[in-house]
Design a protein with these regions (language model features):
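Active-site-proximal alpha-helical scaffold in enzymes
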Residues: 5-18, 71, 76-79, 84-120, ...
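Condensing-enzyme catalytic core mediating Claisen C-C bond formation in acyl metabolism
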Residues: 142-219, 228, 294-297
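A glycine- and small-aliphatic-rich helix-loop capping segment at beta-alpha/alpha-beta transitions
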Residues: 40-55, 105-108, 128-141, 203-204, ...
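Conserved small-residue
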Residues: 9, 30, 75, 95, ...
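Glycine/charged-rich beta-loop-alpha catalytic/anionic-binding loops adjacent to active sites
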Residues: 50-61, 78-88, 145-153, 192-193, ...
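Short glycine/threonine-rich loop-to-helix capping motif typified by GTGT followed
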Residues: 196-208, 234-251, 256, 270-277
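Conserved small/polar residues in nucleotide/adenosyl-binding loops
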Residues: 308-309
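Conserved beta-ketoacyl condensing-enzyme motif
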Residues: 1-90, 119-128, 225-239
Length: 309
């Protein structure tokens, strides 16, 4: 996950056009999200220990490579960013929370610029095995390219994805002063909890509704200003409908005027990196004027019609 993070961060820094020699790196932070962190390291180290023979031992790099905040640390060390630096760990919301925290640190005047996003690398025996034991994964192994099918009546679980998404959030006047290429403005964020179950969402989407309402209030906009929603849409039987209930609950009748899609149908579920990757999808939807599709939704679940077109 830290390797994914470093590559995505390098792409973001390059795309930003920032001259690192002309900025105050004390005012540049890294706030990163990862739901699991170094799961591959954990797996390989425990396996090595168990098979270690007469004197089993763990590598001195075991802990530094495993903990989730090392991605933020690696990025800061590479570029000399000495501002706020930490990792948000909140399962599939990890990089969403990282972006909200980044927004607020800039608002508070604690940073001029923050490199934010998330990464995940959980396609390994414990990652796949653990989610499989929870019956969270699709079993459409005979047709994997159609396995991720949010809102389809035959959806049966998510497909694990791997990777990273990185964004540079920057104080507006600071960005203008250096002639930055500005893709969009981040105007608000909201956070909440269902307080319901440790894996299943609230059946009426109560936590999701609160997060969206708080984001709209924080942004100072009205629900009618929204014309696209990139939903979580993991392709699980339990998750997709409550989310649409939440969107409809927040937008009211305006929901019928809004484009809604799940890009997880194309990327799979990147777990803690999902929010950052999907934020990029939204940014490029704005940039190019194209709404990303929900592929594989061939037989729409009739229950979704109650909440959206």
């Amino acid at each position: 996950y830290s390797q994914y993070a470093l590559v995505a961060a390098e792409q973001a820094v390059k795309d930003s056009g920032v001259d690192l020699e002309k900025i105050d790196r004390d005012m540049v932070g890294v706030i990163w999200g990862s739901g699991i962190g170094g799961l591959e390291t954990f797996y390989q180290e425990v396996k090595s220990y168990v098979e270690g023979g007469f004197i089993p031992r763990y590598s001195p790099f075991f802990i530094p490579k495993m903990i989730a905040d090392l991605a933020a640390g690696h990025i800061s060390m590479k570029y000399g960013f000495r501002g706020p630096n930490f990792c948000t760990v909140s399962a599939c919301s990890s990089s969403n929370h990282a972006m909200i925290d980044s927004l607020n640190y800039i608002r508070w005047g604690k940073a001029d610029m923050i490199l934010t996003g998330g990464s995940e690398a959980a396609i390994n025996p414990p990652g796949v095995g653990g989610f499989n034991s929870m019956q969270a994964l699709s079993t459409r192994n005979d047709d994997p390219q159609h396995a991720s099918r949010p809102f389809d009546k035959d959806r049966d679980g998510f497909v694990i994805g791997e990777g990273a998404g990185a964004l540079i959030l920057e104080e507006y006047e600071h960005a203008k002063a250096r002639g930055a290429k500005i893709y969009c403005e981040v105007v608000g964020g909201g956070a909440s909890a269902d307080a319901y179950h440790f894996t299943a969402p609230h059946p009426e989407g109560k936590g999701a509704m609160k997060a969206m309402r708080d984001a709209i209030k924080d942004a100072g906009i009205a629900p009618e200003d929204i014309d696209y929603v990139n939903v979580h849409g993991t392709s699980t039987p339990a998750g997709d409908i409550p989310e649409l209930k939440a969107v409809a609950g927040v937008l009211g009748d305006h929901v019928y005027n809004v484009n809604i899609s799940s890009t997880k149908s194309m990327t799979g579920h990147l777990l803690g990196a999902a929010g950052a990757v999907e934020a990029l999808a939204c940014i490029f939807a704005l940039t190019h004027g194209v709404v990303p599709p929900t592929i594989n939704c061939e037989n729409r679940d009739p229950e979704t019609v109650s909440y959206t077109h």
